[in-house]
Amino acid sequence: MATANPGRGGGRRGGGAMDDDKLVFETTDGIEPITSFNDMGIKEDVLRGVYEYGFEKPSAIQQRAVMPILQGRDVIAQAQSGTGKTSMIALSVCQVVDTSSREVQALILSPTRELATQTEKTIQAIGLHANIQAHACIGGNSVGEDIRKLEHGVHVVSGTPGRVCDMIKRRSLRTRAIKLLILDESDEMLSRGFKDQIYDVYRYLPPDLQVCLVSATLPHEILEMTSKFMTEPVKILVKRDELTLEGIKQFFVAVEKEEWKFDTLCDLYDTLTITQAVIFCNTKRKVDYLSEKMRSHNFTVSSMHGDMPQKERDAIMNEFRSGDSRVLITTDVWARGIDVQQVSLVINYDLPNNRELYIHRIGRSGRFGRKGVAINFVKSDDIKILRDIEQYYSTQIDEMPMNVADLI
């Protein structure tokens, strides 16, 4: 169990799992995969929620991570995007919660509002018959509503670090009964600006806390940091050279100038029949620029970035999930963990600034083993970044063939 705490002294409906034979795990000795939900000792009402949610068989990461979490161990769980990480979190949380108490017993921190909200919804779905109450504490929503919900009593809080910390300091979120902390997408949370906020939250948590880190990528420096707040963690790791998702075909298109990217995008539209696509840009300004330009050329697109009010972001996400909108232009606020089943194509209009974001972006195009295509627009000064991504993931990104339409 954790913790030396310096302040005191992280799936889907539709059933299938990825082809586990293709995944290579570096896992703590003694961790045996459990291939059936029925063999996990899960409460019947939670199990009913799991099956109703659409799972038939645990995915690779669920087979290995759920039992150590339920046994109270600290866990570092690494799984590719789309392997059922969110559902693994929800299942574990629903099993450990004692519904006879109205106090918060599990806290999940996520880097984006959308991921925190999706986690909350998954917990509510899987925990429906167990009457598990979850609430998303996220910036952009009403503070008053957060206070009201928390004071009424919930079992699980899924939130972003800033708002969660605020609720703790206001004493609306009482931490004395929290026994499980989960850091979802912990690479993003710890390696960027969230580290201080996480430690702020930590200071208020009980000393016998159980800690889990869940992420698609776990760079060496992140694993080093875990020694500060985890005790003998069970490690469930995918080797890095297996991290590019199975079934994702990756290509690049060489564009000499920035201005040529738009024409290239229009040519792609003419060539392809797009079910649903996500187009990633590196800046909010570029998202706005590209969205306006696409609309002026009579393309129907949605767009989203972090400056938009939360209600607007929610409406856009719902529109895209339901299929009413087929093309979403966005920044990396969307790249982590958002589950949309029909996405068949991801276009990196800009290559990501951070190579570790690459897998989060292209992971959208083949969730749970679905096939997908990722196309990267590459200027001459981007070649080095592209090669760096290839080397980092031990993968090959070829020039886009003429028959790309046959691959989507």
Curated annotation (Swiss-Prot):
Pfam families according to UniProt: DEAD, Helicase_C
Example GO biological process: mRNA processing
Top-level taxonomic group: Eukaryota
SUPFAM superfamilies assigned to the protein according to its UniProt record, in alphabetical order: P-loop containing nucleoside triphosphate hydrolases (SSF52540)
Post-translational modification (record): Phosphorylated at Ser-100 and Ser-101. Phosphorylation status of Ser-100 and Ser-101 largely determines the subcellular localization of EIF4A3.
Region (Disordered): 1-20
Binding site for ATP: 79-86
GO cellular component term, pick one: nucleus
Impact reported for residue 100 to D: Increases cytoplasmic localization
Domain Helicase C-terminal: 247-408
Primary localization class, coarse: nucleus
Ranges of biased composition (kind: Gly residues): 7-17
PANTHER family, A to Z: ATP-DEPENDENT RNA HELICASE DBP3
Record function comment: ATP-dependent RNA helicase. Core component of the splicing-dependent multiprotein exon junction complex (EJC) deposited at splice junctions on mRNAs. The EJC is a dynamic structure consisting of core proteins and several peripheral nuclear and cytoplasmic associated factors that join the complex only transiently either during EJC assembly or during subsequent mRNA metabolism. (Microbial infection) Functions as a host RNA helicase that is co-opted by the tombusvirus (TBSV) RNA replication enhancer to greatly enhance tombusvirus replication. Interacts with the viral minus-strand RNA and the replication proteins within the viral replicase.
Similarity field: Belongs to the DEAD box helicase family. DDX48/FAL1 subfamily.
Assembly and interaction partners: Interacts with ALY4. Interacts with MAGO. Interacts with CPL1/FRY2.
Protein name: Eukaryotic initiation factor 4A-III homolog
Gene source species: Arabidopsis thaliana
